[in-house]
């Protein structure tokens, strides 16, 4: 199966892949321009275990890439490197067949059939000029209510804003609309529809780990022995709350492919990432689907008298940064992280927990911070959460903490990669 998103280079890449596969005897099913979650659905619906989805996801518009499924398992990392060892002599010269399949219609029908009477809310949807447009049009025609769509046309230039809904500057338009029109909810998607950004009734972006917490607690009502997974960037409030409610919660490395492997090994019911990937395995297929997750959230709000702001405020007991990306040369970012992991204990005495499953996450009684190398961009990701009752400027707090400042400024990252936090300069 081959599908593609709406980026400017995606169609050309798809056509070249199809031509190459067919020339070597591989039959291809073309599912055309489609969101990534629907391409995953195609492997289930068509009972074909192999998929290439051409997408740059939330990355800058000049980026592109391949999301690969082989034998119903994510194909990444060392598996990709192993392709160099294949013997070309074993390839067929018989021309493979090409067929075209519509999976948008069965996907949409199946999704809609699981939800009823989602008509109480006023919702604004920001499609970000991404590949998700055909799906959302069909869904809102079925769920009724008041629905407004922003940036509905598919355009790989992303003329209105960059397609990453977890970054505040990218959700200014939808935020203003919520405030001006008094809407209940804002839902924004990335370029290929597998990551979600949620805004509450006040137009405020709610971090995806808190949204995942709400969704997990809702699922707990139905599945009492819930097993959940959250990535290393997520709030400690999420982990503590789920654990205190009897959930078997596991911390994972960041990355949708890595989380899918862990879902399988732990037989998890639900999983989520700070970046907005949310995976439902209980009564669903186990892949990250922002469309399905958005309908689950709408269902929660549709069955309560509370606003989203009221539902989430009880968990907003900390001050935290978003993901802060520190530029780092691609060739050295992982080795530099190894050096940081080695150096950090020198700056802290007892009373700290070091979690090194993905970079380093240092936890104390009052705060935690994370430094990890991005899997998809030439940067190192930093996030900090501090538990205080009074709000303050987190940037200044970090700057006043000599230990954190030393870790950042005196590390090999700062010396060799010109990484810095703007508020520490």
Which residues does each PLM region occupy?
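Glycine-rich phosphate-binding loop
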Residues: 49-63, 178-200, 205, 249-289
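Phosphate-binding and adjacent anionic-ligand microenvironments
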Residues: 223-383, 388-404, 408-412
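Proline/glycine-rich low-complexity loops and linkers
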Residues: 22, 82-109, 113, 201-274, ...
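Cysteine-centered motifs
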Residues: 418-419
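Gly/Ser/Thr-rich active-site loops/lids in small-molecule metabolic enzymes
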Residues: 76, 151, 204-223, 287-299
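N-terminal small/polar loop signature for handling phosphorylated ligands or for N-terminal nucleophile
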Residues: 1-63, 139-199
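Gly/Ser/Thr-enriched, mixed-charge loops and adjacent short helices
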Residues: 64-179
């Amino acid at each position: 199966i081959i599908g593609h998103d709406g980026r400017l280079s995606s169609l050309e890449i798809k056509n070249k892949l199809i031509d190459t596969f067919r020339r070597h005897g591989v039959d291809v099913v073309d599912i055309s321009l489609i969101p990534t979650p629907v391409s995953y659905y195609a492997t289930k619906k068509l009972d074909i275990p192999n998929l290439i989805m051409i997408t740059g996801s939330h990355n800058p518009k000049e980026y592109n890439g391949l999301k690969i499924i082989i034998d119903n398992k994510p194909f990444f990392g060392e598996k990709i490197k192993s392709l160099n060892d294949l013997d070309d002599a074993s390839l067929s010269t018989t021309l493979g067949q090409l067929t075209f399949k519509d999976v948008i219609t069965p996907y949409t029908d199946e999704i809609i059939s699981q939800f009823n009477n989602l008509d109480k809310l006023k919702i604004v949807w920001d499609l970000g000029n991404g590949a998700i447009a055909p799906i959302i049009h069909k869904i809102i025609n079925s769920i009724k209510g008041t629905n407004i769509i922003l940036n509905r046309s598919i355009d790989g230039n992303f003329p209105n804003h960059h397609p990453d809904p977890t970054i505040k500057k990218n959700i200014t338009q939808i935020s203003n609309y919520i405030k001006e029109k008094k809407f209940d909810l804002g839902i924004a998607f990335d370029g290929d529809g597998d990551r979600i950004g949620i805004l509450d009734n006040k137009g405020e972006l709610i971090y995806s780990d808190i949204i995942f917490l709400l969704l997990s607690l809702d699922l707990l009502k139905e599945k009492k022995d819930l097993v959940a997974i959250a990535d290393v960037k997520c709030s400690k409030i999420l982990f503590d709350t789920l654990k205190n409610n009897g959930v078997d919660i596991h911390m994972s490395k960041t990355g949708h492919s890595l989380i899918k492997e862990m879902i399988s090994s732990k037989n998890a019911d639900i999983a989520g990432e700070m970046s907005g990937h949310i995976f439902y395995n209980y009564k669903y297929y186990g892949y990250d689907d922002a469309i399905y997750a958005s309908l689950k959230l709408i269902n929660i709000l549709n069955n309560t008298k509370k606003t989203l702001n009221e539902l989430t405020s009880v968990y907003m007991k900390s001050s935290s940064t978003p993901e802060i990306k520190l530029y780092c040369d691609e060739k050295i970012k992982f080795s530099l992280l190894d050096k940081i992991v080695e150096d950090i204990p020198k700056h802290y005495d007892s009373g700290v927990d070091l979690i090194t499953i993905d970079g380093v996450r240092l936890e104390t009684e009052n705060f935690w911070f994370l430094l990890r190398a991005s899997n998809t961009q030439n940067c190192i990701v930093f996030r900090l959460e501090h538990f205080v009752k009074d709000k303050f400027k987190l940037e200044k707090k970090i700057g006043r903490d000599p230990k954190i400042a030393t870790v950042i400024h005196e590390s090999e990252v700062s010396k060799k990669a010109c990484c810095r936090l703007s508020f520490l300069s």
